[in-house]
Regions:
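Catalytic adenosine-cofactor/nucleotide-binding cores of aminoacyl-tRNA synthetases and other
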Residues: 1-166
Length: 166
């Protein structure tokens, strides 16, 4: 659905006329985005999931099944608070965030490359699993110790890419 504010914003932007006219449908989506920008809480989602297995989980986090993480509910409005979620040994990433043979300028996950899991840790890809058709079914990565977001020394390892996960 659309918020009342977004419909008002669309009407304000397009105006009214006695003559017939067309308004691009994308204008409604833009008005909705602009209306929700200041008030909607943020979250992460993965549309086309690919399993990410953190192979050295126990070595870094011990017997902890889940490590707590947090992020601002809205990046520009700290008064909206913080959201909490857990990081575990098996996660889901966007399939497009991994490449067997990366093109030039690809800063996401591929063999030997390091990326930050958004609001999480830095991981380095060590391999992947494929089915009989050659489709990637899982990616294996190792966690780099002491790189958890929000902790001292978290930015000691420089990475070029940050990816979304659930």
């Amino acid at each position: 659905g659309y918020t009342a504010g977004s419909l008002r914003l669309l009407a304000e932007r397009t105006g009214a006329s006695k003559a017939g006219g067309w308004t691009d449908y994308a204008s409604l989506d833009i008005a909705l985005r602009d209306d929700l920008e200041g008030q909607a809480h943020r979250a992460m989602a993965v549309i086309d999931p690919l399993r990410l297995e953190l192979v050295n989980w126990r070595g870094v986090f011990g017997d902890a099944a889940i490590v707590p993480c947090s992020a601002p509910a809205h990046p520009q409005r700290p008064e909206l608070g913080t959201r909490h979620f857990g990081l575990g040994a098996a996660l889901w990433i966007e399939r497009d965030d991994f490449a067997l043979t990366p093109p030039k300028g690809f800063f996401r996950l591929f063999a030997g490359n390091k990326v930050r899991l958004k609001y999480g840790v830095v991981v380095e890809c060590v391999g992947c699993s494929q089915d009989s058709a050659g489709r990637v079914t899982a990616v294996q990565a190792r966690v780099l110790p002491d790189t958890r977001s929000g902790t001292p020394g978290a930015d000691a390892v420089k990475v070029k890419g940050t990816i979304t996960w659930v």
